[in-house]
Amino acid sequence: MAITYNNLYLDIRQRLRAAGIESATLEARELVCFGTNKSREELARDGGLYASPELEHRVRDLVRRHLEGEPVAYLIGEWEFYGLPLDISRDVLIPRPETAELVELIVEESPNARRLLDIGTGSGCIAISLDKKLPDAKVEAWDISEEALAIARKNNDALEARVRFLQRDVLADDWEKIPSFDVIVSNPPYVTETEKNEMDANVLEWEPGLALFVPDEDPLRFYNRIARLGSELLLPGGKLYFEINQAYGRETAHILEMNQYRDARVIKDIFGKDRIVTANR
């Protein structure tokens, strides 16, 4: 029996809700739009029209794959972050709302920053968002992964941003360091190996481990390194911003204090969890 686009969307939303998916409304819309080759506006406009059996089958196959664990962002190859449409692949993490809070904080606190550095850029979501919100600033972004940088540069071009992307291993120490940044931001790997057991299977099986995990015996390795690096790269009065593992808020702030940063703060995210640490140089 033929089904309208709107009823197809409602049916998919109900299936996702029944599966316990909190963001069922958003995910149903994205899957139906992608599966039927319609924009959100076109889906709303054509809601009363009938979908062809081929399109309905395509949408339901996408839903099946999602219910088996494949994230929507990887199914459709894109995800929205801070109002920007980003290409996404399994080479990068799926941008999350907590990270958008980090961008918003930087924009609010450092609107006059002229040079910003994003370490571990992944899809480029932080760097590109900052570039778009702070048009007078110059943004640089680093990642160790060639594949991630390819995605980031693609997003940079598509969104007509001006971020300078470099392949760089932040744990290495093989380049000249000149104080030149007003802001350094990083959302580095921070999930311990032990915490794997607490993670959703769709994250473990699909998202890149290189961007997620750190060894149990050295869970703050990136924060220690970037704090020291920031002391060399930040201009006087510059600011350092971290997204963190909620279990290590106080410890991360202590690292900054031990590296002579001032006014270290631990900030909770929209879910009430310690998620951001920031301090002044």
Q: What does each model-identified segment do?
A:
Residues A2-I76:
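N-terminal auxiliary segments of SAM/dcSAM-dependent transferases
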Residues I3, L26, Y50, E54, ...:
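Residues at secondary-structure transition points
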Residues Y9, A28-R29, V59-R60, G69-V72, ...:
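A general structural signal for well-ordered alpha-helical segments in protein cores
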Residues Q14, D61, E101-E104, K154, ...:
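Generic recognition of well-ordered alpha-helical segments
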Residues E42-L43, P85, A211-V214:
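A short acidic, helix-capping loop that chelates divalent metal ions and anchors anionic groups
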Residues R45, A51, H57-P135, V139-I151, ...:
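SAM-dependent Rossmann-like transferase core, predominantly class I methyltransferases
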Residues K133-R281:
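S-adenosylmethionine
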